[in-house]
């Protein structure tokens, strides 16, 4: 039988519920338990797929092609269980399903209400997503007290009543601020946050106390007294050197043992040696490199969360400190490429829309002509093709129809037909909705023998995740290949270009897929590892 841990947040948002949930899950997994994590998002969008990166940050793509919250990226980086479309749902998704049932007549003419219909649908999805796990952590987005979260919290309350307190508990993450002028931490915000929980019928069983400073024993006793939480269940969670040090921190405070005892589970001792090795490598690098990342969402780095972590993971695997220089592509358009001169390697990530595209194209040209290691991802591959077409193949008007609908030389165009993650044929037109209409999820890719990328992976057939609706136009491939561009990866059916490489260059790889979605701190990723190694070689050779 599955046990449920409902994770809520109080006082302020962005305290790190996702990291806390993932860290506890990692410890429980290290004790031999099968775990999973769900994220319940209270916004009315059906999914984050059409939301601006400035609003929401990264859209994380799962193996089965779901566009989900970036917290699912944290979950996959901390535990071995792959996330699916069942691990994340929103208010919009819930209401969409309930309204569909009402239109179909499933409610037999009854009045459709938040309770029981919306809460029942939430409970159904939680139980479905948690099926098969020994322990499921359910992270409720937002902050206790927000009107948007109320249906989710009520559904969690009901589910705990239904399964019993031996199979469910509430873990509340709250802020314990340090007031510098007073020289002490303050517990009052936590007390008020728990009071807010009680007002809707919820009593936390565990409190995680986020603070810049250690929450001392006397403060924990005070919190326990005024919140009706067992003292040993008031767990400090102060700022750490790295998020990957948090599993060890929480384990030393006894959080996992508390959960094991509460649920009556039989579990072995936690083996956190892999996490200790990750932190040791991260904190004791033997070299360092500087990567220039040229994108258009630099005002909110969460838009590139998985990518930033992937470079960090590559540094862990190579014992290299990876310094990232974040550069807005519009700055390249305005001021030129001199800002790239200090970089040991250059990366252009994915993105949407015309703004900043010419700056990315100029970045590619700089990397190609100056033999600087280059990694292009998604749009980063498309601009690499455009740059090569213009400056090497002689297609001076080369562009993408995403940015120039009537360009005379559309070297990148809309995909109209492809196979999805399950092998089913998908078709799209210019009139299709934006939401959920991209080529999404894991796809097989066949690499070319002798290419740089096959040297990274060490095998010819790989499987990586996609999120795009534009592709290289096959009509122009003969002209591009004649000019020297190497097509070093194609889709399994051979119809879509997945990887290109530039000739006579030490390391120039551009891929249509998103390798950052499968990188983890314990395993790294072969493409990012190869990229950082190329940056090291360039640094030492310069």
Curated annotation (Swiss-Prot):
Task: Tell me which EC number(s) this protein carries.
Answer: 6.3.4.2
Q: Name one GO biological process term.
A: 'de novo' CTP biosynthetic process
**Annotated region Amidoligase domain: where?**
1-265
**InterPro entries, from UniProt?**
Class_I_gatase-like (IPR029062), CTP_synthase (IPR004468), CTP_synthase_N (IPR017456), GATASE (IPR017926), GATase1_CTP_Synthase (IPR033828), P-loop_NTPase (IPR027417)
Tell me the active site: 378, 514, 516
Q: Where does Mg(2+) bind?
A: 71, 139
Under catalytic activity, the entry for this protein gives: UTP + L-glutamine + ATP + H2O = CTP + L-glutamate + ADP + phosphate + 2 H(+); L-glutamine + H2O = L-glutamate + NH4(+); UTP + NH4(+) + ATP = CTP + ADP + phosphate + 2 H(+)
Keyword annotations for this protein, in alphabetical order, are: ATP-binding, Glutamine amidotransferase, Ligase, Magnesium, Metal-binding, Nucleotide-binding, Pyrimidine biosynthesis
Q: Where is the Glutamine amidotransferase type-1 domain?
A: 290-541
Q: Which residues bind ATP?
A: 14-19, 71
Task: List cystine links.
Answer: none
The biological pathway it contributes to is: Pyrimidine metabolism; CTP biosynthesis via de novo pathway; CTP from UDP: step 2/2
Q: Which residues bind UTP?
A: 13, 186-191, 222
- Protein name, please? CTP synthase
Give the classification, highest ranks: Bacteria, Pseudomonadati, Pseudomonadota, Gammaproteobacteria, Pseudomonadales
């Amino acid at each position: 039988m599955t046990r449920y841990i409902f994770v809520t947040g109080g006082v302020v948002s962005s305290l790190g519920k996702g990291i806390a949930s993932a860290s506890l899950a990692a410890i429980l997994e290290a004790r031999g338990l099968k775990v999973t994590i769900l994220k319940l998002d209270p916004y009315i969008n059906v999914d984050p797929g059409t939301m601006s990166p400035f609003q929401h940050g990264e859209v994380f793509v799962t193996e089965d092609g779901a566009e989900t919250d970036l917290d699912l990226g944290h979950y996959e980086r901390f535990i071995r269980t792959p996330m699916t479309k069942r691990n994340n749902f929103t208010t919009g998704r819930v209401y969409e399903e309930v309204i569909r049932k009402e239109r179909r007549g499933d409610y037999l003419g009854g009045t459709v209400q938040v309770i029981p219909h919306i809460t029942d649908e939430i409970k159904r999805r939680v139980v479905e997503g948690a099926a098969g796990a020994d322990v499921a952590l359910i992270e409720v987005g937002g902050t206790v007290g927000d009107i948007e979260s109320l249906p989710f919290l009520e559904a969690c309350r009901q589910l705990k009543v239904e399964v019993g307190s031996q199979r469910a508990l509430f873990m509340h993450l709250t802020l314990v601020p340090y007031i510098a002028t007073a020289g002490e931490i303050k517990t009052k915000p936590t007390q008020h946050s728990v009071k807010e929980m009680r007002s809707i019928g919820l009593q936390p069983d565990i409190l995680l106390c986020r603070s810049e400073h250690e929450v001392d024993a006397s403060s924990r006793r005070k919190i326990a007294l005024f919140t009706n939480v067992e003292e040993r269940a008031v767990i400090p969670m102060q700022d750490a050197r790295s998020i990957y040090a948090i599993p060890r921190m929480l384990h030393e405070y006894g959080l996992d043992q508390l959960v094991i005892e509460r649920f009556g589970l039989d579990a072995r001792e936690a083996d956190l040696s892999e996490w200790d090795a990750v932190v040791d490598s991260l904190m004791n690098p033997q070299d360092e490199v500087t990567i220039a990342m040229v994108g258009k969402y630099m005002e909110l780095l969460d838009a590139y969360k998985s990518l930033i972590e992937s470079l960090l993971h590559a540094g862990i695997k190579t014992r290299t400190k990876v310094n990232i220089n974040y550069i807005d592509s519009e700055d390249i358009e305005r001021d030129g490429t001199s800002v790239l001169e200090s970089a040991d390697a250059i990366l252009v990530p994915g993105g949407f829309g015309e703004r900043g595209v010419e700056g990315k194209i100029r970045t590619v040209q700089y990397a190609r002509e100056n033999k600087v290691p280059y990694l292009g991802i998604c749009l980063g591959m498309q601009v690499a093709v455009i740059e090569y077409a213009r400056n090497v193949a002689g297609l001076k008007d080369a562009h993408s129809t995403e940015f120039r609908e009537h360009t005379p030389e559309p070297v990148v165009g809309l995909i109209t037909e492809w196979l999805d993650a399950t092998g089913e044929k998908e078709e799209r037109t210019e009139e299709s909705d934006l939401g959920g209409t991209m080529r999404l999820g894991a796809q097989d890719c066949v690499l070319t023998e002798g290419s740089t990328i096959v040297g990274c992976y060490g095998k010819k057939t790989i499987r990586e995740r996609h999120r795009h609706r534009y592709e290289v136009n096959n009509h122009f491939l003969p002209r591009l290949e004649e000019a020297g561009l190497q097509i070093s990866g194609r889709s399994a059916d051979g119809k879509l270009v997945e990887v290109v490489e530039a000739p006579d260059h030490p390391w120039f790889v551009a891929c249509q897929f998103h390798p950052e979605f499968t990188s983890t701190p314990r395993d790294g990723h072969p493409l990012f590892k190869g990229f950082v190694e190329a940056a090291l070689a360039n640094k030492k050779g310069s």
